[in-house]
Amino acid sequence: MENLIDFSDPILRLVLPILLKDQTTGKNIIWATDPPPKVDCGPMGEITMEQLDRIRLMPRVQKRLSEQKKRTKGKAEVFTPLWVVKKMADHAEQELNKGDWEQFVHERCLEIACGEAPFLTSRYDPTTGEPVAIPDRVGILDRKLRAIQENANHKFQWKALVLSAYQSVYGYEYQGDNLLLARVNLFLTFTENWIEKLGLPISTSWAIAVATRISWNIWQMDGLKDTVPGTDTLCLIFDWEENKEVTFRQIKEESDNV
């Protein structure tokens, strides 16, 4: 099975400090699970670049079967087959896409307890580990990017709409290693689409802009309390339309009152 995520990739390493950041605390995201033995810290310890240089952080499908079973038993961690992801994402797209492709790109959506974020981007099959070609990906972000690929008239429009697509997708996850994998998957989806569409080296400024949006929109949270795991601190997210920080709980309460 090929390496699905290469943490030595220069453009990924450039933005890793951003992808590791918890925008609520201003620190790095925490493990919030039992870290690998080589890490030498507890569940409340931050995930750092130095740790990632010592271990091989990999998607669930590439872990030993015994480790997968341990996570399923201890953390209720299960991953959805790609065909199920597709059927559910088909339904979500029907709700979001009313025929105006550009409006579809801007429609906001949230993947709860997102794990490695397969409902946003399906870079690989969660159960087999097989890479999925860009035209065959089924996540909601994948579909937004495909709409942009098919309809954007020039590269400037393409870039602006891709940024809007990333501003429109949200997800939260408790366990820090899964959260980082989700963030990295979204970032690599950007770089892969950039190369496919533009055929140019990745722009540093655009890579940073996309990574910043990912670090705000895909965040670490205890979904039962709306807080940073192990604390009473309410999680912040960013409302890109209003250009301001808000608590996730505030968004929930406003939605309940609609």
Predicted regions and their residues:
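Helix N-cap and loop-to-helix transition residues
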Residues: 80-81, 175, 247
